[in-house]
């Protein structure tokens, strides 16, 4: 039985062509570190790393200074570095009712440490209620953290309006782009985003364990480094260096991951985000259209492909969702993710808590035939 992979919201598979080979080549043929030695191979590795930073800035519309592109292990580490580096007891943080635990759990820790936290409400489709969001701002509000697209319903937030509201109140905006980066084009400067947190292993089609954040100088001035250690620069000082990106990159970087991510970014540039987005939206609309009229399921989020990414959650009203997910693999070879998707706030907003949903997430290699097979299986099992 052929497997149909529809769990790209968890991690993309397959990766962009050449990602694995680039990582293998680095490990087996290069293997050096950066900023730690002065021989030619390290200089070449540093140049390759710089190129990936430049590609990230270009992809996200972050300006021309690649030193503001910071590498971390992924979006979770990035969000922790932003939130815990920018906020102090007495400050006020705003998040939304659709956030992943990568935002909600750091927010809970910060609240226990004396930071006031507000959760902005969203409508039944998961879209932020902008008027109610703006009413939450106080003179002590320092940071708003919002996901761009939901990992449960695929809902895309109105980031332009969110950015404008934050700017109007002089509040920094950090964005969780885990389900947005690589799926559609956007410009963080035009959207007035101060820090964009990303992960390499989802829509960017890169490896696990590599991600980061791209920020502007406003965010840099507000941050205290969360992690301290060796950088290979200013080694005589016991303080973290003020220069970027070293200030936020203590320890040995994940160079195989960076090389793999670089290949993935070049693939996205060659194919074009607009082309990938059109294809994903066509498949998403096909999926949603094929399920309309089935009274035994509920699909939270926007009713059509407009306003969402290719993440489709299905709540089976007559069946146990976990059992359905098991049967999808056993009977049909369809791989999905069932449960709360590390996003209990989102499921509470969407009315699918505590049971959760069965999530189908489309990837860049998903075919019409695979979507049709999933539709038939859902109707069979509902």
Where are the predicted features?
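Pyridoxal 5′-phosphate
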Residues: 1-382
């Amino acid at each position: 039985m052929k497997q149909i992979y529809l769990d790209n919201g968890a991690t993309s598979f397959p990766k962009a062509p050449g990602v694995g080979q680039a990582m293998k080549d680095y490990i087996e043929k290069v293997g050096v570190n950066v900023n730690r030695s002065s021989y030619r191979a390290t200089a070449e590795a540093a140049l390759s790393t710089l190129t990936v930073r430049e590609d990230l800035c270009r992809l996200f519309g972050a300006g021309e200074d690649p030193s503001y592109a910071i590498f971390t292990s992924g979006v979770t580490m990035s969000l922790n570095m932003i939130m815990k580096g920018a906020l102090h007891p007495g400050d006020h943080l705003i998040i939304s009712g659709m956030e992943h635990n990568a935002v909600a759990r750091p927010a809970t820790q910060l609240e226990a440490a004396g930071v006031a936290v507000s959760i902005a409400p969203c409508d039944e489709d998961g879209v932020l209620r902008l008027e109610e969001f703006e009413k939450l701002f106080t003179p002590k509000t320092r940071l708003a953290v919002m996901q761009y697209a939901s990992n449960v319903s695929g809902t895309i937030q109105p980031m332009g309006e969110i950015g404008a509201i934050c700017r109007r109140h002089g509040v920094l905006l950090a964005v969780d782009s885990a389900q947005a980066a690589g799926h559609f084009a956007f410009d963080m400067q035009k959207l007035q985003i101060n820090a964009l947190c990303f992960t390499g292993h989802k829509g960017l089609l890169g490896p696990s364990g590599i991600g980061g954040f791209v920020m502007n100088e406003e965010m840099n001035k507000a941050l205290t480094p969360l992690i301290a250690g060796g950088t290979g620069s200013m080694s005589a000082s016991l303080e973290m260096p003020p220069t970027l990106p070293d200030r936020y990159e203590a320890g040995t970087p994940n160079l195989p991951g960076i090389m793999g991510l670089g290949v993935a970014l070049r693939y996205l540039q060659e194919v074009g985000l607009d082309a990938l987005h059109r294809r994903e939206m066509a498949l998403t609309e096909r999926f949603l259209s094929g399920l309309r009229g089935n009274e035994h399921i509920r699909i939270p989020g926007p009713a059509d492909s407009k306003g969402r990414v290719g993440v489709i959650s299905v709540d089976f009203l007559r069946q146990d969702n976990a059992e359905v997910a098991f049967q999808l693999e056993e009977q049909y070879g369809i791989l999905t993710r069932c449960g709360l998707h590390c996003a209990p706030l989102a499921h509470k907003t969407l009315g699918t808590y505590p049971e959760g949903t069965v999530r189908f997430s489309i990837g860049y290699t998903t075919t019409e035939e695979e979507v049709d097979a999933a539709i038939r299986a859902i109707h069979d099992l509902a």
